[in-house]
Structure formats: structure tokens, C-alpha cells
């Protein structure tokens, strides 16, 4: 029997940069996001933190394509994607994993992957080979015929990550990936996300309130409050920054 063939993998140097240029969003007279700039580079993991009301979620949803910016641009390499809908962004290389469960509950783990792969212009045998390769990569081969509703929170999250890779994205946008996941599964998901960066060269952009679990992964951190980016730097610099402690982390925070 022939081993499943993995999808072609691009090195980080072959992938475009994802950049936000002066993003702004207002609702009536209330400015929620004001002139936000950030960059996610291929092969790095970047976190966006912020207290409630900081504009973090609005910024993240502008990147995903749920909310249209009032000002500014979003580019993927030299391509302006600001006004493109979510499915067009996905086609260009922006993958998205929502906070809410997104696996099809009444499909098996394998069929969850095939349901997405069927939309790609691939022979059926290659679709099945890619599905099996992803199941193996994410430690789900033994659950390939289990229905999604039968999986634990950690298993389901791994399936959703695998499904996000069926489109061979350049970037994955992860919304609260550690919510509802037990500590052991969190460590496994952290390992898998690192492998996406290290082995596939994928850029990962995370927003999550689980600061310690997220910061353990990240290469760089952005912090928002009052609708603006107030900090950008390494996790170590973030943990030591006075403004970050005052507005978000608290004085007793330790890495």
C-alpha cells in the first residue's frame, strides 16, 4: 500500500508577508480601532493581546474578513485583500480557525477533511491521500472513522487545525485556540502549532485570553488598548513592559 502523499510545502522564504496598514473602524462617533499597523511574517507566530474593549476582536475580524475596515488596508504580499470576502482571502492563503466548534458533528474525522478537499481540483485518490496524511500528522489516524461529536475537546481542536490545512494556507488566524481544551491537550496543540511554523513555514496569528499558553508559543507580541497598538516586541519584553503590566498583565505577572 502506498503511503499517503502530503501536500506540497512552501518554505517561509517563498511566502508573502501579511500586513495591516493604518486600520481604523468607527461605530457612529465612537472610534473602536484607530490607526493600527502590524505585520506577520512567514514562519513566525504572533499574538495579539488586549483587555476587553481594546479593539482587539474588531481588529482580528477585519483581518479575517468578517468586518470591513473604515480606514486602512490589509495586504498579502503585494495583493490588497482589504475588500475581499473571507472565502476569497482563504483562496489566496489566509486560513481561519474560529473559537467556536467548527467541525461537522455528524461527519467522521476523515470525512470532515474530505468535505473541504472535494472543493479542490484534485483527483479523488489524491484527496484521500491528503486526508490520510493530515490525520497522521495530527495524531488522528485511529479516530478517522469516529464522528466529530464523539471526539474530546482536544481531539476536535486537532481535527479543526488539520482541516484548516486542507487549503495549504500561507497563514493561519487562530481565534482563542485554547478555549475549552484541557491542559494536556493544550500542550499537544502548542506542539502542533510550532510544527506549522518550523516544518511548513506557515505564519500564525493568535488572539487568546490564555496569556501564558499563548506567549509560550510566540515570537512576537502586539498589545492593544484604547483602540491602538501600544506595544510590539518579544514575549520577554512584553512581560517586563510597565504599560503592559498596568493595562493588561497585572503587577504580579511572571513568565
Q: Could you tell me what each predicted segment is?
A:
Residues 80-100, 124-128, 144, 238-242:
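ABC ATPase NBD coupling module
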Residues 49-51:
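The feature captures the beta-strand-to-loop junction immediately N-terminal to the Walker
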Residues 172-176:
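Catalytic Walker B motif of ABC-type/P-loop ATPase nucleotide-binding domains
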Residues 79, 114, 125-143, 191-194:
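Conserved ABC ATPase "signature" region
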Residues 147-151, 155:
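Conserved ABC ATPase signature
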Residues 168:
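Conserved catalytic motifs of ABC-family nucleotide-binding domains
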Residues 64:
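Helix-to-loop junction immediately C-terminal to a conserved catalytic motif
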Amino acid at each position: 500500500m502506498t503511503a499517503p502523499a502530503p501536500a506540497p510545502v512552501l518554505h517561509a522564504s517563498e511566502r508573502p508577508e501579511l500586513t495591516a496598514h493604518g486600520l481604523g473602524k468607527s461605530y457612529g462617533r465612537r472610534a473602536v480601532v484607530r490607526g493600527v499597523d502590524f505585520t506577520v511574517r512567514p514562519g513566525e507566530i504572533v499574538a495579539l493581546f488586549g483587555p476587553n474593549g481594546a479593539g482587539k476582536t474588531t481588529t482580528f475580524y477585519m483581518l479575517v474578513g468578517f468586518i470591513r475596515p473604515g480606514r486602512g488596508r490589509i495586504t498579502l504580499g503585494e495583493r490588497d485583500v482589504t475588500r475581499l470576502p473571507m472565502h476569497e482571502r482563504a483562496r489566496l492563503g489566509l486560513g481561519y480557525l474560529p473559537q467556536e466548534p467548527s467541525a461537522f458533528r455528524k461527519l467522521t474525522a476523515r470525512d470532515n477533511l474530505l468535505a473541504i478537499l472535494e472543493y479542490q481540483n484534485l483527483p479523488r485518490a489524491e484527496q484521500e491521500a491528503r486526508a490520510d496524511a493530515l490525520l497522521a500528522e495530527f495524531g488522528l489516524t485511529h479516530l478517522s472513522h469516529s464522528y466529530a461529536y464523539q471526539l474530546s475537546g482536544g481531539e476536535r481542536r486537532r481535527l479543526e487545525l488539520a482541516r484548516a490545512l486542507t487549503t495549504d494556507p500561507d497563514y493561519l488566524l487562530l481565534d482563542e485556540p485554547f478555549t475549552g481544551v484541557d491542559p494536556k491537550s493544550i500542550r499537544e496543540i502548542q506542539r502542533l502549532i510550532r510544527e506549522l511554523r518550523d516544518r511548513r513555514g506557515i505564519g500564525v496569528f493568535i488572539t487568546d485570553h490564555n496569556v501564558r499558553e499563548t506567549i509560550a508559543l510566540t515570537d512576537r507580541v502586539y498589545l492593544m488598548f484604547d483602540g491602538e497598538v501600544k506595544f510590539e516586541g518579544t514575549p520577554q519584553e512584553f512581560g517586563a513592559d510597565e504599560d503592559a503590566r498596568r493595562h493588561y498583565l497585572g503587577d504580579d505577572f511572571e513568565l
